[in-house]
Amino acid sequence: MNEDFKIIILAIFDQNDFPHKAMTDIHGKPMIQHVFESARGSGASEIVIATDNTRVGMAAEDFGATVCMVMDDNQVGISRLAEVADKMGWGDDTVVVNFPGDAPLTPSSIIQQVADNLKLHPDADCATLYSMVSAEVAAKKSTIKLVVDNSEYVMYLSRIPIPHQVSDKYKVTEYRCYIEINAYHVGLLRIYRNLPESELDWAENIEELKLLYNGMKIHAAEANSLIGQRVINVEDVDKVKIQIAPNR
């Protein structure tokens, strides 16, 4: 399946976990450029880097990216996507994939898979992917776990391992780890801004819980490729440098 979709790469400058990380040098290029180059292989009809910082915007323009400046007002990611869609003039039926600006090792095929997943499930309001991880990985609060029904629609997402093992009837050895790349129709992004807030979102700091709280449907498929290391903190930079070829 190769239908039209757009990509928005969010590159917010002063993130609490790692300020200025979009501009982190990886083999002579800012990290955001490596992310952009991964996105180009996905078959998307348009790629937009959304940032609240002129330094990031100028760097992105220098390597040929389309840039959309967003407001520096602490919006959540989904609301920022809606702001970009409004500024780009995209219609409600346009499919948009959000691609994190700190995921330079993500294969292009993953981006296309999540866009295809939304098109394959027209009753879904959002589509995403997951990978199976060990209990050791699932124990980390930085990884978001999810559970699905028998049609792979998301029932809940959490920073603690779910399902929690109590009964001996079934031994939980692996967990579904949420890959934070989603596909939406632009119309849903615009609706999201006006949905009632969710205390579940506030408690877990997972904005997709606001969708579930308001009766929206999220379909999750297992990723068809391994997902590389993300740059969550400064310590991750050297790990990523080892995995990215110097001439890339």
Language-model segments: what does each one mean?
Residues 1-19:
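N-terminal nucleotide-binding beta1-loop-alpha1 segment
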Residues 4-9, 32, 46-47:
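Hydrophobic targeting segments
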Residues 13, 52-54:
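Residues in the short beta-alpha loop(s) of Rossmann-like NAD(P)-binding domains
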Residues 13, 71-77, 225-227:
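Short, acidic/turn-prone active-site loops that include or flank metal/cofactor-
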Residues 31-46, 58-63, 213-214:
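A short, N-terminal amphipathic alpha-helix
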Residues 48, 55-116:
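Short phosphate-binding loop-to-helix
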Residues 108-196:
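Conserved core of the sugar-phosphate nucleotidyltransferase
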Residues 173-248:
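Conserved alpha/beta core of the MobA/IspD/sugar-nucleotide pyrophosphorylase nucleotidyltransferase superfamily
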